[in-house]
Each structure stands twice: as C-alpha cells, then as structure tokens.
C-alpha cells in the first residue's frame, strides 16, 4: 500500500473519530489502530519512518482519551439509579445521558484495550508469566507498540483501566489523571520515567509487582480506596510523597535502589511497608498514620529519615536493620511501639520522641550512637537482652515531662548490656568489610552484610552476666 493511500486512510479515520455517533467514533479509532499496525509491520518501509507515523497515530488516540467529556463530571449521578420524583422530561433526559455516558465509556475503554493488547509483554521462553513476583525485563518480549510514547496526562477515566502486564519502553505519562473505577497496572515494566503524580484514584488501585527502570513519580496522589503497590522494584529515584491514602496502603516487599521520597503523606487506613529494602536514602518524614503501621523486617542500607511523624495506633518496626543513620526525632508513638530485634549500625536518633504506650526495644542492637535526649515515656521502656555500644556518644537524658524514667545500669538502659571490647573490635572489622560508613554501592556488599547481620543477631547476644563472663575470659 502506498504512502498516499495510508494518508487517505488516516484522514478518513480522523473524520470518523469526530462523528457525533459513538459507534462511528469507535470505527474511526479501530481504523487508526489497524493503520498503526500496518506502519510498524511494513518491511518494505524504513523502520524509523513507520515508527514516526505510528507515533502520530498513538498521539492522536491518547489525545482522544484525554479530551474532556462533559457527562463524565456527572459520573456518580449517572451511574446510580434514576432518582425519584423526576418529571417525564427529566426522566427521559436522565436515561439519555446515562446511555450516552455508557456509549462513550465503551469507545474509550475499547481504545485502551487495543493499546493494552499491543504493549502487553510475554515471557521470552514462551511459558506462562509468573504471578505474585516482579518480571525480569531481560526475559520478556515486549509488545508491538511498547517502544512508542504514551501521554494520558489529565485524562478522566470513567471506566475501568486495565494495563496489567504491560511494557512501556518509552515510559508513560499519566500525570493528573482521575480514575473513577478500578485501575490495574500490575506486573508492568517501565523502561523510562513513569509519571503518575497528582492523580486521584476513586476505586481500588493495583500496581503491584512492577519494575521501574528509571524514575517513578507518584507524588501528590489521592488513593481513595485500597491501593496495592506490593513487590515493586524501583531502579531509579522514586517520589511517593505528599499522598493521601484513604484506604489501606499495601507497599510491602518492595526494593528501592535510588533515592526514595515518601515524606509528607497521610495514611488513614493501614500502612504496610513490611519487608522493604532501601539501598539509597529513604525519606519518610512528616507522615501521619491513623491506623496500624508495619515496617518490620526491612533493611535500610543508607540513611533513613522517619522523624516528625505521628503513629496514632500500633507501629511495628521490629526485626529491621539500619546501616546508616536512622532519624526518628520528633515522632509521636500514640500506640504501642515495637522496635524489638532491630539492628542500628549507624546512629539511632530518638531525640524528642514521645512514646505514649508500651515501648519495646527487647533484643535490639544499637551499635552506633543512641540518642534518647528529650524523649518521653508513658511506660518504662523494655530493653531486655538489648545491646549497646558504650564507647559511642550515647545520650539518655529524657525530657523532664516524661512520666517514666529511662532506667540505666552501667550507663546504658537497664536490661541491656554493652558490647565487649572483643565484640567492638570484631564489629569494626566487619563493618569495614561490609562497606559501612562510606559512600558505596551496598549491592556489592550483600554477602558480608548478611553475614554481619547474622553475627550481630545470633552471636552478639546474651544477658549482662554472660557478657561479663565473656569479657573476663
């Protein structure tokens, strides 16, 4: 087919896309989809030329999806039952508007389906894709349109969005979107920046098991229902700050390789960050958690900033490892605070923290400088079988307004013990081998870091009496 014939097809399809009839608009959209496929699969035409022509079509389809549709503003009214007490004329108008909204939703939903079919990835080996795990981008075959650019910014999706298992090789722009129904992006791969900032999700959001190979922008979003971002891999920087989570926020089992910005957010439902791994600096300051907050069994390879946050109910930060400085200064734990069995290799800053209920540091390892200056406790904190580094610059002078003291024995919290001289020497050597305390790629030190964690947890243990015996021996 000649270029002129394809140009004529493009012009005709655009005319159909502007029809007042929904079924004709759909025909125009499908004609454009077919034409884009023709450009990309024509082996007689230079590849770059076909790609440019296909990109023009994609841009047109995205512009249609983003174009305003007046009745979408009345989504809730038109999706409900016909109101009582309408006049016959009002009832006819309601039914007509409801039908028109449904027809346009079908057109736009079908366009998204056609796009999804062409950015959908499949395993390179021809097998079935694994579920409940992020895909390996090197072991998938991208879709025909995966290398093209998609800009849906500002779109109002008044119909379900399903981009499950998609490969966005040039990234995707979904900034400022509104999702009136469910949004599904599970097991997606983003080869360039993925932009979801300033979006509103009225329905459930599914973004789990996805891989972000460049930057990920999800800041200033409102998640109106449960949101699932479990098991994601962020290879670049990620911005999830200034979000409002109205439902449960599931962000467990994620891996963050770059700078992670999760500050200034409000969690009105449960917040779950269980088993997260942060390689770069993690900033989670100035957050408010209205329900349970789970951070246990996580690893921070660089500095962790969680200060000036409010935990209104139980906060579980147990079994967590901090390789860099950990900042909790100014936090308020209104519910129980579980920090037991955690390890701080760098400084642990709890200055000015208010612990208003039970506080558990049992079997914790605070091996850098521990700062509890100005902290306040409603109950005596538990440090049973904990371990401190007495050679560090520890500060234990609590606030004068604290209802309970921080009982000390031998200069450290009662129930805990100090590292022996031998343990301090071994710790220093192993920290150096693990690349701690300097700018480094923590991924290169996985084995020595894992070995050091095991040593600290299972060999640097025991009661104060046992430590004294070890020192004497």
Predicted regions: what is each one?
Residues 8-15, 20-33, 38-473:
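N-terminal leader/targeting and pre-domain segments
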Residues 1-5:
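Transmembrane signal-anchor/signal-peptide helices with a preference for the extracytoplasmic
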